[in-house]
Design a protein with these regions (language model features):
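N-terminal secretory signal peptides that target proteins for export/translocation
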Residues: 1-23
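Hydrophobic topogenic segments
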Residues: 20, 26-28, 201
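Bacterial N-terminal signal peptides
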Residues: 25-38
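Glycan-association/targeting regions that enable binding to alpha-glucans and other polysaccharides
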Residues: 193-302
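Activation on beta-sandwich/Ig-like modules and their edge loops
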Residues: 39-192, 215-219, 226
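Hydrophobic beta-strand segments
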Residues: 62, 77-79, 253-256, 303
């Protein structure tokens, strides 16, 4: 069994504040696209450079990656939604890459030697986030990514003091900081920001393996819920989360929780045994519960 150590709250993990009078729910991700991934031909959206540090939109690019063992002809395929581009007759070799550039000439000057490239799309990638959709020649969606510059697509950090108070800010180096947005593990769904990260090198890695690539990354923690939504002082609170990984067995996660009266976090293991409000044993949904708390107690927790 491998153990992945995650950072404490303040670094992008899912945190929830519970109050027996008023409960606020965490921002939740949906599991989708987990079972059969990828759908068509193994081609996935693998890298997005949507906000160059230069602010020159002609430097934007999207990289596709063929994860399969067969070459894929993208003739008459299209990029839709965020930008619009129809592919010429171009083939992506097995386990190879194709760069789609906003302006092929500008890209070639900035990244000499990178091949193959196509380009000249209509539109501009949003700096705040939007949806990119890849369609095959029949108009069927092959892949779709809705990226963002906050939430699970960024890292939460302490903000600057403001009137003697410090709040939280989102840090996304791929948002104008000189980095691209790269897929960590193309063998897992790219629908979730947990499987993406800012490149570790300036300008990203177009036409090559991603700098953040990791075939054995920590499991994605999705669908974090608590129940009841507004707990009473007599209620134990059930916490559930779905773990998604390239391995189907041997997964484990811990729940850290702390009432506002406590200084240290308490730890409980999330279990997938069918006996902790987690549905069926072995279904990937993990559960645990925390004790009832007096009325008015706020509880911070993370998985």
């Amino acid at each position: 069994m491998e153990i992945f150590y995650q950072k404490k709250p303040g670094t992008g993990l899912r945190t929830v504040s519970l109050n027996t009078r008023l409960a606020k729910r965490a921002v939740l991700a949906t599991a989708g696209w987990i079972a059969a991934w990828p759908l068509f031909g193994g081609v996935v959206i693998n890298e997005i450079h949507y906000h160059p540090a230069s602010e020159d939109v002609r430097e934007e690019f999207v990289e596709l990656h063929n994860t399969g063992d067969q070459a894929v002809n993208l003739g008459s395929w299209s990029l839709r939604r965020g930008v619009r581009f129809k592919f010429p007759k171009v083939t992506v070799p097995p386990h190879g890459y194709l760069v789609v550039a906003a302006d092929a000439a500008v890209f070639a000057a900035k990244h000499p030697g990178v091949q193959p490239i196509v380009g000249g799309w209509d539109g501009v990638l949003s700096n705040r986030g939007e949806t990119l959709r890849l369609e095959n020649a029949n108009g069927k969606t092959v892949d779709s990514v809705s990226y963002a510059d906050e939430g699970e697509w960024a890292v939460r950090q302490r903000g600057l003091p403001h009137y003697k108070h410090r709040g939280w800010d989102w840090l996304a180096e791929h948002d104008g900081g000189g980095k691209s947005l790269e897929l960590v593990n193309p063998g897992l769904s790219n629908k979730h920001g947990q499987n993406w990260a800012a490149s570790t090198v300036e300008e990203g890695t177009p036409g090559a393996a991603n700098s953040v690539f990791n075939a054995d990354a920590a499991p994605m923690i999705l669908e974090v819920h608590h129940s009841p939504v507004v707990p009473q002082s007599s209620n134990r609170v059930r916490i559930t989360a779905r773990l998604v990984d390239e391995q189907k067995t041997g997964l484990a996660a811990d729940l850290f929780y702390r009432p506002d009266s406590a200084e240290d976090y308490q730890v409980a293991s999330l279990l997938d045994d069918g006996a902790h409000g987690d549905g069926l044993a072995g279904d990937g949904l993990f559960g645990q519960s925390i004790p009832a708390c007096p009325d008015g107690t706020a509880v911070e927790l993370y998985v």
